[in-house]
A protein has these predicted regions:
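Carbohydrate-active catalytic/glycan-binding domains of CAZyme proteins
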Residues: 4-10, 21-336
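Sec/Tat signal peptide C-region and signal peptidase I cleavage site
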Residues: 17-19
């Protein structure tokens, strides 16, 4: 996900990339060009919904299909457009669509017109059964413990509680953003303490910028897995992993173990660079897990990566190791 004044600027370091056998491609890739920070959800009606950041950072788009592959050619609708003045007027980033109860919500990041790096988390609500219809009501800023640079809100439930994971700059911290977690009292309200899950401590998390962002959760095999993205939004971008026992207290930082190495990085063999800001969904069979992410088809970028539009939405099967942990493999090659 792009970042603002705390992290603005171009990267000059050249990152390493993974070397592995080229995986079999089960899907058409890229799925959608020039759509970054992709979030795909499968609703109970069997339909898939895709939203993502657009290069202009000025609107929230949505498309739907009965199949994952169909999202690539589905008609795209603009469901919300930035304000021209005041709040929510700039840097519309990383929307996520969630159905909570009988209501749709979109979580996204935005900044005011007069301070475009004052990025915070905002919430939209739509009571219609169809998220393309009805009215998207602005429910305001989702307040965290600090009024600082914050983005990439991701909500999930576990053992009857709803949680929000997000990225934020911690006052006094020596990093751009870390990952935080809190329980939710309602779709746009946190309750109780917020805990720090991770800060950029390894070299691979600090290439260009010291960043942990873009959390996403998948629960399998008695564990809660939270992926996140690290480093600058160029070819250095990669994914890390946090793991908690499903029986543990997720609000205890000690419940979470952090993988010391990235779990998903760019690949010279397949020609994909800077993969990250992922989400998870399932295939049409209801069993096969699918990794959703963005990547660029080249490593070199002229100028600020924020201004390079070619982060494309991609999907591929997510495998599982015999020990019950996810096997991300490497980004699949383009098929088109």
């Amino acid at each position: 996900m792009p970042r603002g004044a705390l992290v603005a600027g171009a990267l000059t370091a050249v990152p390493g990339v993974a070397h592995a056998a080229t995986p079999h491609a089960a899907y058409r890739n890229p799925l959608v060009e020039r759509r970054a920070d992709p979030h795909i959800t499968r609703h109970t009606d069997g339909r898939y919904y895709l939203t993502a950041s657009v290069p202009e950072y000025d609107r929230i788009v949505l498309r739907s299909s009965r199949t994952l592959g169909g999202l690539g050619t589905a008609e795209e609708s603009v469901v919300w457009t930035r304000h021209t003045t005041g709040d929510m007027a700039a840097h519309i980033w990383a929307p996520e669509l969630h159905r909570i109860g009988t209501t749709w919500y979109i979580y996204f990041a935005a900044a005011p017109a007069d301070d475009i790096w004052k990025i915070r988390i905002w919430v939209l609500e739509n009571a219609s059964a169809n998220p393309f219809r009805g009215t998207w009501t602005e429910r305001g800023q989702l307040a965290t413990a600090w009024d600082t640079f914050s983005l990439d809100a991701h909500t999930f439930t576990h053992r009857g509680d709803r949680y929000l994971a997000w990225a934020q700059h911690e006052p006094g911290a020596g990093s751009n953003t870390g990952l935080f977690l809190s329980r939710m009292a309602g779709p746009w309200t946190l309750t109780g303490p917020q805990i720090r899950l991770s800060t950029p401590e390894y070299d691979w998390e600090r290439v260009g910028f010291a960043v942990n962002e873009g959390p996403a959760v998948i629960k399998r095999n008695g564990r809660v897995f939270m992926t996140y993205s690290a480093s600058a939004t160029d070819a250095s971008y990669c994914m890390g992993l946090l793991t908690a026992d499903a029986r543990s207290d997720l609000m205890d930082p000690a419940s979470w173990a952090k993988s010391p190495e990235p779990v998903f990085t760019g690949s010279e063999e397949t020609g994909q660079y800077g993969p990250g800001h992922n989400s998870f969904t399932v295939a049409e069979d209801g069993r096969t897990d699918v990794l959703v992410y963005h990547a660029r088809p080249y490593p070199e970028i002229t100028g600020d990566p924020l201004h390079d539009p070619n982060r494309h939405t991609r999907i591929q099967r997510l495998a599982w190791k015999t020990d019950g942990t996810p096997d991300f493999g490497i980004p699949v090659a383009d098929t088109v």
